[in-house]
């Protein structure tokens, strides 16, 4: 915990959308009268037909939540059409390529035309309302066009991060039964090509229900081509009309499926719907980032993750913002890249991850100080808790002590930000996520299911539904209930721990379930374990997180080999490469320890608490080990940890 406190500057209190008095008044109304509050706020969207009921359902029983029942609207209309009269010539999307010499801008009018054309392309291929499409694209403008085109005609998109492996892509295509896959010949990241079409071909080869593959020519490289199945994006767009009326969608119609890691190994298809999600992202984008006309807003997240969905595309465009989209990485061609983009485009609001901040901080101040950054007025962080040291560097060096930092907490499942400082309303505490957003009722519970009042540390739960939340796990509502509503009855269990201080501010302490937060991206330990165990040399594997100075958490794997295989550095490297191929680079173990056996209870359950402590080198007190079937295994692991440290 940091004892530092940064009061709200007087200029911010006067100019921000939300000051302290407004926050208290709006928050109180949102909790005491949610129907009245959200019904009033929904007026910021354009509706084809008004809703009959604002809110239905609770966190009890079968948990069927509905917002704005009977209302009809269209996401692309709210993000594009309604801005054409007043903002048609304003830049909607500023795209910065991997190569600093390459960039593009699309006005609202141009983006609207492109979206309508691609919506007509999809209709010409037989796609209709409710069909699913898998998008496997790099961070290029066509990704934004494709997702908005889906919303225009009621097609449900499932975007898969371009860094995922063919196997991970296949699993996601198969789960949602996507009829069409949209990909590129290659991606570019840090000057290196990514073989996206090759990966997509491998994935689609085992998905016979996929009818068409649409390919964007990003690099112009030679790629395999399946006649009758594969179609060229540009060729299709040239033949399509730029006139496509928006489909009138029910507020509770599915908008997108986004897969996130679960503790059981199989990724969960988080399903978000239309009206509540769009309202929540638009409102929170304006309020939390204090977005005003003329701001240039940049969220650095890849659209393959929820942050990119909500705060690169949907929230900003619903508000008529200019949003920056970046294809590359912070260190290419050098460590000043982020700050040069800020200067090049006049970025005023920057939203990035603690992992990136820590990596940039490690390079020292010089790459930052050689740039100007005078346009910046607000900074944000997302994906994981930020340590006070990184917070202070971000504030002092990047923002030059003039830019408030909004340290936001939320999840794929929540749709938008749930806990955050408001820059014009709250003093900032480095490392604290501060207060709940409107309509959000957080609480802290102990392991016995008791609510903790006042100060305390425990499991973070949300006690009432909010409009942006997921509605189910696609195709598996029971898993939705088991994952979020079985640990504690009648509340949403976040899977995160938290502490509430004497001021009522929240501090997120990290995951409490079998999920690792690597660079702000959630990975299920079971998913990595399954990949390791699929290797012919591995008998068993257990994976835990451990503190990592750059990523926040790293991946620590305990591997038991089959009796006919011997540990070696070559095998260790082979296993890391194997996981990269099976899941993606994000899941590659940082550390592999050879383990003769794993600590298991007599019922066969792995005691992960012990594995976490050993991985973190916190071995002074391993706790009660009397329930282990073979206590001697712990000594072997401790010796192995020590030996590995000296390798």
Swiss-Prot record:
Post-translational modification: Acetylated. Deacetylation by the SIR2-homolog deacetylase activates the enzyme.
Biological process according to GO: acetyl-CoA biosynthetic process from acetate
Record PTM N6-acetyllysine, positions in chain: 605
PANTHER family: ACETYL-COENZYME A SYNTHETASE (PTHR24095), ACETYL-COENZYME A SYNTHETASE 1 (PTHR24095:SF14)
Broadest EC class assigned to this enzyme: ligase
Residues that coordinate or bind Mg(2+): 535, 538
Residues that bind CoA: 189-192, 307, 331, 519, 580
Enzyme Commission designation: 6.2.1.1
HAMAP family: Ac_CoA_synth
Family according to the record: Belongs to the ATP-dependent AMP-binding enzyme family.
Designated name of the protein: Acetyl-coenzyme A synthetase
SUPFAM superfamilies: Acetyl-CoA synthetase-like
Record bears the keyword Membrane: no
Binding locations of ATP: 383-385, 407-412, 496, 511, 522
């Amino acid at each position: 915990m940091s004892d530092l406190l940064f009061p709200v500057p007087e200029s911010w209190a006067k100019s921000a959308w939300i000051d302290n008095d407004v926050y208290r008044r709006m928050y109180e109304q949102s909790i005491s009268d949610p129907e009245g509050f959200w019904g009033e706020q929904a007026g910021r969207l354009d509706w084809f037909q008004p809703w009959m009921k604002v809110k239905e359902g609770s966190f009890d029983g079968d948990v069927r939540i509905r917002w704005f029942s009977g209302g009809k609207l269209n996401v692309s209309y709210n993000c594009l059409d309604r801005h054409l009269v007043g903002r048609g010539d304003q830049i909607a999307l500023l795209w910065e390529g991997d190569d600093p010499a390459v960039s593009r801008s699309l006005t609202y009018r141009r983006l609207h035309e492109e979206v309508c054309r691609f919506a007509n392309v999809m209709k010409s291929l037989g796609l209709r309302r409710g069909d699913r499409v898998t998008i496997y694209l790099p961070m290029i403008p066509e990704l934004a066009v494709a997702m908005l085109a889906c919303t225009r005609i009621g097609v449900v998109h499932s975007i898969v991060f371009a860094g995922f492996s063919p196997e991970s892509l296949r699993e996601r295509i198969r789960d949602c039964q996507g009829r069409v896959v949209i990909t590129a010949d290659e991606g570019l990241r840090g000057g290196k090509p990514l073989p996206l079409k090759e990966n997509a071909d491998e994935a689609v080869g085992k998905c016979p229900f996929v009818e068409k593959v649409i390919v964007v020519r990003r690099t112009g490289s030679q790629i395999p081509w399946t006649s009758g199945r594969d179609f060229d994006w540009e060729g299709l767009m040239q033949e399509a009309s730029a006139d496509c009326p928006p489909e009138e969608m029910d507020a509770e119609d599915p908008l997108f499926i986004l897969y996130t890691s679960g503790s059981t190994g199989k990724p969960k298809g988080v399903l978000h719907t239309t009206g509540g999600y769009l309202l929540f992202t638009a409102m929170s984008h304006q309020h939390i980032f204090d977005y005003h006309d003329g701001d240039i807003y940049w969220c650095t997240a890849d659209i393959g993750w929820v942050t990119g969905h909500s705060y690169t595309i949907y929230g900003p465009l619903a508000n008529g913002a200019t949003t920056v989209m970046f294809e590359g990485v912070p260190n290419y061609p050098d460590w000043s890249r982020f700050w040069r983009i800020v200067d090049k485009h006049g970025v005023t609001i920057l939203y990035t991850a603690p992992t990136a901040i820590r990596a940039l901080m490690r390079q020292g101040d010089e790459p930052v100080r050689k740039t100007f950054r005078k346009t910046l007025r607000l900074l944000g962080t997302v994906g994981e808790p930020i340590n006070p040291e990184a917070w202070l560097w971000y504030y002092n060096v990047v923002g030059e002590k003039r830019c408030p930092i909004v340290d936001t907490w939320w999840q794929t499942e929540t749709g938008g930000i749930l806990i955050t400082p408001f820059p014009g309303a709250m003093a900032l505490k480095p490392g604290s996520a501060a207060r709940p957003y409107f309509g959000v009722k957080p609480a802290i519970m102990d392991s016995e299911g008791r609510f903790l009042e006042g100060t305390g540390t425990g499991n973070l739960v949300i006690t009432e539904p909010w409009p942006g939340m997921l509605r189910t796990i696609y195709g598996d509502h029971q898993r939705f209930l088991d994952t979020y509503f079985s640990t504690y009855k009648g509340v949403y269990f976040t899977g995160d721990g938290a502490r509430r201080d004497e001021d009522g501010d929240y501090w997120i302490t990290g995951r409490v379930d079998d999920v690792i937060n690597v660079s702000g991206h959630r990975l299920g330990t079971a998913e990595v374990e399954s990949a390791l165990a699929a290797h012919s040399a591995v008998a068993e594997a257990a994976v835990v997180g451990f503190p990592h100075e750059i990523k926040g958490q790293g991946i620590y794997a305990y591997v038991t080999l089959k009796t006919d295989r011997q540990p070696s550095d070559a095998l260790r490297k082979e296993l890391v490469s194997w996981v990269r191929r099976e899941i993606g680079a994000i899941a590659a173990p940082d550390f592999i320890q050879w383990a003769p056996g794993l600590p298991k209870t007599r019922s066969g359950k792995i005691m992960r608490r012990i594995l976490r402590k050993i991985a973190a080198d916190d071995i002074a007190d391993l706790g009660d080990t009397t329930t282990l079937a073979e206590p001697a295994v712990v000594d072997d692991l401790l010796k192995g940890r020590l030996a590995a440290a000296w390798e």
